[in-house]
């Protein structure tokens, strides 16, 4: 998914095999840990491609057919990270804020078409993300008990089926999203700096 033509290859495969997609789930993504200027530049480019561009392109390729059929749901994986700046994981947090905002906007655009778009915003999830992002100095997974991947998937499925635009997973995630809106942004940034180590 980190290649610029990855989304087109997926879309073209469905055309070649005559597969109709009416419920795409855009859940590919990854994070990286460290100060912005110290993280590998190619890894940062790949993160932006996977977390933002491929998700946008897949949505763009599949949405017209869904709108034409007046049926379907798009489920985009955002994160509780979408509600705050994330020092030491700045591109990941920014990418998830993009996904949330993008999903909400497109959801409104398609509101009268029979198609829904849902942004799923889980907190820490037991998927191997922590190891892949090299978060050994982060306190995120020790401060917040990770949800199971199955529970997050179930929450996303149910939200998409109900046509929800935004879905939080669990009370800690909902609490963090509320706190991020009520507290000064400087307080949120400092808190996330401590959480991220």
Residue map of PLM features:
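Conserved NAD(P)H cofactor-binding loop of Rossmann-fold oxidoreductase domains
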Residues: 27-32
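C-terminal helical subdomain
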Residues: 119, 140-175
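Substrate-binding pocket helix/loop in short-chain dehydrogenase/reductase
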Residues: 35-36, 43-45
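Active-site loop immediately N-terminal to the catalytic Tyr-X3-Lys motif
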Residues: 37, 86-90
């Amino acid at each position: 998914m980190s290649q610029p033509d990855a989304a087109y290859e997926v879309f073209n495969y469905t055309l070649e095999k005559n597969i109709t997609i009416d419920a795409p789930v855009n859940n590919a993504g990854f994070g990286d840990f460290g100060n912005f200027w110290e993280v590998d530049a190619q890894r940062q480019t790949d993160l932006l491609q996977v977390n933002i561009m491929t998700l946008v392109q897949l949505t763009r390729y599949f949405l017209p057919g869904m709108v034409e059929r007046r049926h379907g749901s798009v489920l985009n994986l955002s994160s509780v990270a979408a509600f705050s700046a994330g020092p030491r994981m700045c591109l990941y947090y920014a990418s998830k804020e993009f996904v949330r905002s993008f999903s909400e906007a497109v959801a409104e655009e398609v509101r009268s078409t029979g198609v829904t778009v849902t942004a799923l915003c889980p907190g820490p999830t037991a998927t191997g993300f922590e190891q892949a992002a090299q978060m050994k100095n982060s306190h995120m997974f020790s401060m917040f008990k990770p949800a199971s991947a199955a529970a997050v998937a179930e929450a996303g499925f149910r939200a998409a089926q109900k046509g929800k635009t935004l879905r939080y997973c669990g009370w800690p995630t909902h609490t963090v999203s509320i706190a991020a809106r009520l507290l000064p942004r400087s307080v949120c940034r400092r808190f996330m700096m401590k959480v991220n180590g």
